[in-house]
């Protein structure tokens, strides 16, 4: 019985505790439509014009490469009819250059002469893929170029790179004997615009 009395007393005490008074409710805010302002278009004062973007400079790879190839073909120690691996030209400048065009100009300059038998591009691409190299990646180092030349049974490898400032680049070419790694010929020149 005392238990029931204690429970009832606790219930009465708790129900008698003051609770928070109900907060007054506010009426909802009314929304007033606002007219959007029409933006004014700025007008340029007469005489001001938009500056022209810089013109893209084109490089004359054929005119830059052909004299170097002519020098190379007359170098001592070059055996006519030998198999030559032409490595793709490497870009060592401070910007971006159309290196694929340079490699194409190198191939066309060498294929017009009869001094070398060039490793076909398809065979070179297949060999790079077999060795786990990217097809359009320049080999990056002379030792990799010589290793690839050994893989395709070439006697010579032509390593070329373009260096310096992108606005006035220099092309360097080295003809190397695959068997020994000896540099048979080396030449360089400015890339013409």
From Swiss-Prot:
Pfam families given in the database record: LpoB (PF13036)
Signal peptide: 1-16
One of the GO BP terms on file: peptidoglycan biosynthetic process
Membrane topology type: Lipid-anchor
Entry GO CC: periplasmic side of cell outer membrane
Record note on quaternary structure: Interacts with PBP1b.
PROSITE patterns, A to Z: PROKAR_LIPOPROTEIN (PS51257)
Molecular-function annotations in GO: enzyme regulator activity
Keyword Transit peptide found: no
Family the entry assigns: Belongs to the LpoB family.
The keyword Lipoprotein is annotated on this UniProt entry: yes
NCBIfam families associated with the record: lp
Subcellular location as annotated: Cell outer membrane
Principal location listed in the UniProt entry: membrane
Keyword tags: Cell outer membrane, Cell shape, Lipoprotein, Membrane, Palmitate, Peptidoglycan synthesis, Signal
Protein name: Penicillin-binding protein activator LpoB
Function in brief: Regulator of peptidoglycan synthesis that is essential for the function of penicillin-binding protein 1B (PBP1b).
Species, as recorded: Pectobacterium carotovorum subsp. carotovorum (strain PC1)
Biased composition (Low complexity): 28-41
Regions annotated as coiled coil: none
Cross-referenced HAMAP family: LpoB
Disordered: annotated span: 17-55
């Amino acid at each position: 019985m005392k238990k029931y009395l204690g429970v009832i007393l606790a219930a009465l005490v708790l129900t008698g505790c003051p609770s928070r008074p109900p907060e007054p409710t506010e009426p909802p805010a009314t929304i007033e439509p606002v007219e959007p302002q029409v933006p004014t278009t700025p007008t340029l004062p007469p005489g001001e014009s938009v500056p022209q973007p810089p013109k893209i400079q084109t490089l004359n790879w054929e005119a830059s490469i052909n004299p170097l190839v002519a020098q190379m073909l007359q170098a001592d120690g070059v055996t006519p009819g030998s198999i030559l691996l032409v490595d793709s030209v490497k870009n060592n400048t401070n910007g971006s250059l159309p290196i694929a065009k340079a490699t194409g100009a190198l191939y066309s300059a060498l294929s017009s002469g009869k001094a070398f038998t060039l490793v076909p591009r398809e065979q070179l691409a297949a060999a790079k893929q077999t060795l786990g190299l990217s097809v359009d990646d320049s080999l990056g180092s002379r030792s990799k170029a010589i290793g690839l030349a050994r893989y395709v049974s070439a006697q010579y490898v032509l390593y070329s790179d373009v260096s310096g400032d992108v606005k006035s680049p220099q092309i360097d070419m080295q003809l190397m004997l695959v068997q020994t790694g000896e540099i048979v010929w080396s030449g360089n020149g400015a890339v013409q615009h």
